[in-house]
Each structure stands twice: as structure tokens, then as C-alpha cells.
């Protein structure tokens, strides 16, 4: 189909909706199995909320900069195993301690369970041996990117661990996207309006009243005091408009923002087509921005 980046080749067979309510348990099981197989070889820690954290350390005693990186999965599924290669690269190439936390999923565990799990992981990381607490970044992919943005807001508001930088890859930021006119589903891949609405409905099912910014960062009233950011998204991503708008709001508030827009890229492109030149360039830019912010 025309309109997708040519580096991705034929995308006709890529699903428009990677997960459905009826297949959610299967996806969770398969990712948990993969996580068990890979996680046995990774250092593990446990947060104050009893959630496991995968830990990747660079060579040397430190103190090292650190990255708390949250996996994607639409707030309803996922596992650190999908971020294993990226975490190893960051530890080796940037010399940072990388923490991949697990967190609660909707609809069984709605807001604020997931973000509180992320906050507990941030507190653990700030106090971890070999970590320089003045050089901590938060980031994530998709739902993890949205949680990272929410975490920066929560840490600011609570006076919690200092965050130097936020690295937001195609973040899931705005619950109001489910109420807007849906784009043509033929123009997107992996994540579409139907599953997005179902995921947000489950995540926010216990919210009574206005949706807080720590649930949906696009509801943020006052950006002042948030850390500088690198924010990236594809133009064929359902989240494109909300991500672009959020980056613009941060920049308008005087927060340094590097907004990277990939023409013709769909949601999940950097994982699904990781060998495409445009994907490699995108990930290289992410890592370069992280290195510059932390070192």
C-alpha cells in the first residue's frame, strides 16, 4: 500500500490489530514464557511493590548513569523480554545501568496500579548500588512511553527521584484519542482504534471524574518543571497526532524537546522492521540523544 515508508517493503500482511480481547491471554502467556526463558540469565531485583525488575549493568563499578525503560503492550500486556536487546545495547554502548520493570496490566489492575509500580521501580533505581541518582532517565515504548511521561509528571509532583531526561518512543499519551473520529484502519498497522479504545477503557475503569495527567499525560495542565525530552513517532501511527501535540506543548512551555517524526512509519515499526535502514537510523538517534543527556 502506498504511503508507508519504502524501507519497510510489503506491509500488506502485517496485522492492523496485534492483539484482541479474545487473544489477550495467549499473548500474555507467550510473552511470559519468553520472559522466563530469557530472564533466567538476567540480574533480577524486586521493588517495594513486589514487582520484578530486570537489571543490566555496564562494566566498572560506577557510579553510572541509569535508564528506567518501560516495555510496551497497550497497558494490557507485555514483558521486559521485548526490550532485552535494547537494554543490553544501552548498557554496553552508553555505559548506563538499565532497569526493565514489570508492572500491572489492565483491565484486571487498572490505574493507578501500573504507574505506581513504575514509580516504585524508579525509587529502587535511584537507590541502587552503582547508580548516579543525578543522572537518571526514564523512557519506554508505546504504553511504556506513556507511563514514562506520566512518571516524569508524578516524580515532579511528589518531589521524588530526580529525572534528567525522558525518552519517549511512540508513546501512548491521550485517552481522548478513543473519542475522536477514527482514522482509516487501512492506513495503520499493529495498533488500531478498536483495541486502543478497549485498552483505555480498561485502564481507566476506576477513574471517577476528570482523568489525571498521571493516567493520561496529555491531560497535563502545567508542563513547567518536567525534564527535557526526546520524542519520536511515525506518521502512520494512531498516536501520531497526540504525540506531536504533546511534544509541541512541552516545547511551548520552554522544555527542550527533540521531536523526531518518521514519515510513513506505523506503530511498532522499529521492532517489526528492525533491520530497515529507517528503523536503524531511528534507534541510533534515540541512543545518541540518551548518551548526550546522561554523559
Feature-to-residue mapping (PLM):
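A glycine/proline-hinged amphipathic helix-loop "lid/cap" segment
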Residues: 1-58, 295
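Catalytic nucleophile-loop/oxyanion-hole region of alpha/beta-hydrolase
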Residues: 79-80, 86-87, 99-135, 273-279
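Alpha/beta hydrolase fold serine-hydrolase catalytic domain that processes acyl esters and thioesters
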Residues: 134, 149-295
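Short beta-strand-to-loop junctions in surface cap/lid or active-site-entrance loops
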Residues: 52-63, 218-223
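Gly/Ala-rich beta-loop-alpha elbow adjacent to hydrolase catalytic centers
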Residues: 140, 144, 148
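Short beta-strand element of the alpha/beta-hydrolase
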Residues: 64-73
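A fold-wide structural signal in alpha/beta-hydrolase
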Residues: 66, 95-99
Amino acid at each position: 500500500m502506498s504511503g508507508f515508508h519504502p524501507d519497510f517493503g510489503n506491509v500488506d500482511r502485517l496485522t492492523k490489530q496485534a492483539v484482541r480481547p479474545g487473544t489477550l491471554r495467549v499473548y500474555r502467556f507467550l510473552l511470559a514464557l519468553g520472559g522466563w526463558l530469557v530472564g533466567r540469565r538476567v540480574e533480577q531485583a524486586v521493588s517495594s511493590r513486589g514487582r520484578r525488575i530486570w537489571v543490566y549493568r555496564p562494566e566498572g563499578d560506577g557510579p553510572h548513569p541509569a535508564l528506567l525503560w518501560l516495555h510496551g503492550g497497550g497497558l494490557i500486556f507485555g514483558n521486559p523480554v521485548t526490550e532485552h536487546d535494547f537494554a543490553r545495547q544501552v548498557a554496553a554502548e552508553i555505559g548506563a545501568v538499565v532497569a526493565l520493570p514489570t508492572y500491572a496490566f489492565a483491565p484486571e489492575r487498572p490505574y493507578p496500579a501500573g504507574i505506581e509500580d513504575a514509580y516504585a521501580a524508579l525509587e529502587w533505581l535511584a537507590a541502587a548500588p552503582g547508580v548516579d541518582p543525578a543522572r537518571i532517565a526514564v523512557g519506554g515504548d508505546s504504553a511504556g512511553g506513556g507511563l514514562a511521561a506520566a512518571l516524569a509528571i508524578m516524580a515532579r509532583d511528589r518531589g521524588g527521584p530526580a529525572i534528567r531526561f525522558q525518552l519517549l518512543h511512540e508513546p501512548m499519551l491521550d485517552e481522548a484519542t478513543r473519542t475522536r473520529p477514527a482514522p482509516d484502519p487501512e492506513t495503520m498497522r499493529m495498533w488500531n482504534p478498536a483495541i486502543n479504545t478497549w485498552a483505555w477503557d480498561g485502564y481507566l475503569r476506576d477513574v471517577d471524574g476528570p482523568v489525571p495527567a498521571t493516567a493520561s499525560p496529555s491531560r497535563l495542565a502545567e508542563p513547567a518543571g518536567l525534564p527535557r525530552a526526546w520524542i519520536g513517532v511515525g506518521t502512520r501511527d494512531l498516536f501520531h497526532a497526540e504525540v506531536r501535540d504533546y511534544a509541541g506543548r512541552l516545547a511551548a512551555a520552554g522544555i527542550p524537546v527533540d521531536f523526531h517524526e518518521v514519515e510513513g512509519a506505523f506503530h511498532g515499526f522499529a521492532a517489526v522492521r528492525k533491520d530497515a535502514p529507517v528503523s536503524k537510523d531511528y534507534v541510533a538517534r534515540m541512543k545518541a540523544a540518551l548518551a548526550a543527556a546522561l554523559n
